[in-house]
Amino acid sequence: MATIRWPAPAKLNLFLNVNGRRPDGYHELQTLFIFLDHGDWLEFEPLPDTDQLTLSPAIPGVPDEQNLIIRAARLLQARLPSPQGAHIRLEKLLPMGGGIGGGSSDAATTLVALNHLWQAGLGEDELAELGVQLGADVPVFVRGRAAFAEGVGERLQPVELPGAWYLVLKPDCHVATAAVFQDPDLPRATPKMAFHNLLEGEWKNDCELLVKKRYPEVANALGWLLEYAPSRMTGTGACVFAQFEDEKAAREVLAKVPKRWDGFVAKGENISPLFVTLQQISDWDIAKR
């Protein structure tokens, strides 16, 4: 059987409002997630009768106990009736510290793929509950649908957004999410609004001004991109993005991007490429019976 390549797609926060800080230190948010048809790729080779997990290539500076891929697999292993292991191969295309969900998406793909390959039998809700232990963004990747998120990101309302193309730039810096949310200068008082009102209003990112102040390269990239199209930062950065009606317009601007920044063009997707892959595999399995 041919090895299956499982996608771990990027996401964008089309807006991000910080509504307040909870007593436990987490923040109340309202945000809108959409997936992109661009991301990392993972391959999984199941290893029966062992709990061994290996990842290649290793991510420099990230030990196994901190790696979200290994941590996701360990969480799933704990739900199995008998030992199962895996050798995992990662093709890393998404930047770390970029605000486009690279680590969270890898974790979600690991949960979804190994749940299938190990025949663990966990449902979507159970996988999402495991995912939230790894990060607030993991459940949206597990569920695989563009969504309006509230709370700390755990309350998800699926949405259907118009098709669009995006140009994403990665400034040459790494933004730590925890540092942004711990910063005393972060705005934390945006009033909560109903989703339909948010859709009709001006989309913004409450983290953007702070991150631009702390990371001048983000401000430079955003300023450059704003010359061509309305642009915002995604998540807590460092990536910034602009929306276009068609691929041609986005690629014309990509061709002009200064060499000091990495960038890519991708299509927005309401259904995650991971969800599409899982459905295709499930259909193949049914057809073989």
From Swiss-Prot:
Active site feature: 11, 137
Enzyme kind, highest EC tier: transferase
Pathways per UniProt: Isoprenoid biosynthesis; isopentenyl diphosphate biosynthesis via DXP pathway; isopentenyl diphosphate from 1-deoxy-D-xylulose 5-phosphate: step 3/6
E.C. no: 2.7.1.148
Residues binding ATP: 95-105
UniProt keywords, alphabetically: ATP-binding, Isoprene biosynthesis, Kinase, Nucleotide-binding, Transferase
GO biological process: isopentenyl diphosphate biosynthetic process, methylerythritol 4-phosphate pathway; terpenoid biosynthetic process
Name by which UniProt lists this protein: 4-diphosphocytidyl-2-C-methyl-D-erythritol kinase
Organism: Aeromonas salmonicida (strain A449)
